[in-house]
Swiss-Prot record:
Entry annotated with the keyword Calcium: no
Biological function: This protein binds specifically to 23S rRNA; its binding is stimulated by other ribosomal proteins, e.g. L4, L17, and L20. It is important during the early stages of 50S assembly. It makes multiple contacts with different domains of the 23S rRNA in the assembled 50S subunit and ribosome. The globular domain of the protein is located near the polypeptide exit tunnel on the outside of the subunit, while an extended beta-hairpin is found that lines the wall of the exit tunnel in the center of the 70S ribosome.
PROSITE patterns the UniProt entry points to: RIBOSOMAL_L22
Organism: Rhodococcus erythropolis (strain PR4 / NBRC 100887)
Family: Belongs to the universal ribosomal protein uL22 family.
Lineage, broadest ranks: Bacteria, Bacillati, Actinomycetota, Actinomycetes, Mycobacteriales
GO biological process terms held by the UniProt record: translation
InterPro entries xrefs: Ribosomal_uL22 (IPR001063), Ribosomal_uL22_bac/chlpt-type (IPR005727), Ribosomal_uL22_bac/org-type (IPR047867), Ribosomal_uL22_CS (IPR018260), Ribosomal_uL22_sf (IPR036394)
Oligomer and partners: Part of the 50S ribosomal subunit.
Name under which the protein is recorded: Large ribosomal subunit protein uL22
Length: 134
């Protein structure tokens, strides 16, 4: 992704091979997509899901990348894109009765977050999107 003059500047962070199932991580990512970075981190701090911790780390890393590499103001950052892909699956065996064995699949995730710097306005991205649809 190249930053052009007309587009808003973006920063990206990726966490690979995170030991959480992609389905559970997607539930958490759906909570914060489109929100400001500050709101997203506050939501994840109190979310009961275990996947909220690695997602919060990736969002914080993307915000730090934007601040340190692109000199962007952290208060203007919004989680523009966030998605979870499936990583490698660790295969384990659980011994069962009479010599059988069941396969256990320990799934991993690749969590990607792209934050975007928006000009400061009175409404958030989520409110503007809802208002335009009505």
């Amino acid at each position: 992704m190249s930053n052009t003059e007309t587009a808003n500047p973006t920063a990206k962070a990726v966490a690979k091979h995170v030991r959480v199932t992609p389905m559970k991580a997607r539930r958490v990512v759906d909570l914060v997509r489109g929100r400001s970075v500050e709101d997203a981190l506050n939501i994840l701090k109190f979310a009961p899901q275990a996947a909220s911790e690695p997602v919060a780390k990736v969002i914080a890393s993307a915000a730090a990348n934007a601040e340190n590499n692109l000199d962007l103001d952290p208060s203007t950052l919004v989680v523009a894109t966030a998605f979870v892909d499936e990583g490698a699956t660790l295969k384990r065996f659980q011994p069962r009765a009479q010599g059988r064995a069941f396969r256990i699949r320990k799934r991993t995730s690749h969590i990607t977050v792209i934050v975007e710097s928006l000009p400061k306005t009175g409404t958030s991205t989520r409110n503007r999107r809802k208002g335009s649809a009505q």
